[in-house]
């Protein structure tokens, strides 16, 4: 009986998630998204994306505390079933793990992924394809892990993925 209760609860949470988890970026016009991409990219010239506020010019190759330039570095991406049921649903949360997290939390659970700087250099076009691929794999959302220092590039990738048909919410 308890197993049925758990299954019913998971199903209810899944349905609620699918009803209410709409991608808010779909409400924005193409022009508004482009404006936000431009505005975010300007921040990279005197980087204050994170609380460290290094103010380095990442567009000129300068590296700040996060040791990141213009190119996104992704450790891994794929469906992840380890989140809470409303987020992971039945087919997983489309998780993208970014490297070089700027917080450097002492008790970070993703230390090897987020703080060791190992990963794959990725263009915004490739990131857009990764997002769309996660949707095609049936993921219920795009789950960005340690993304703060790459927000301008993520916005640019999002602008490229929307015309391809990306509709998943970002979490």
Predicted regions and their residues:
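Conserved Radical SAM active-site core
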Residues: 62, 66-171
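Flexible, acidic/Gly-rich N-terminal and inter-domain linker regions that tether
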Residues: 7-92
């Amino acid at each position: 009986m308890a197993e049925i209760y758990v299954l019913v609860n998971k199903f209810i949470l899944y349905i609620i998630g699918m009803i209410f988890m709409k991608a808010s970026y779909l409400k924005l016009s193409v022009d508004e998204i482009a404006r936000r991409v431009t505005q975010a990219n300007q921040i990279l010239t005197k980087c204050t994306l994170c609380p460290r506020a290094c103010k380095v010019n990442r567009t000129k190759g300068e590296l700040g505390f996060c040791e990141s330039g213009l190119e996104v570095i992704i450790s891994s991406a794929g469906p992840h079933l380890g989140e809470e049921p409303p987020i992971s649903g039945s087919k997983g949360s489309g998780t993208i793990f970014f490297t070089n997290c700027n917080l450097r939390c002492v008790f970070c659970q993703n230390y090897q992924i987020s703080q060791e700087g190992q990963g794959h250099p990725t263009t915004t076009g490739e990131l857009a394809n990764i997002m769309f691929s996660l949707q095609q794999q049936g993921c219920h959302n795009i789950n960005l892990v340690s993304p703060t220092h790459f927000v301008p590039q993520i916005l640019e990738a999002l602008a490229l993925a929307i015309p391809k048909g990306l509709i998943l919410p970002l979490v």
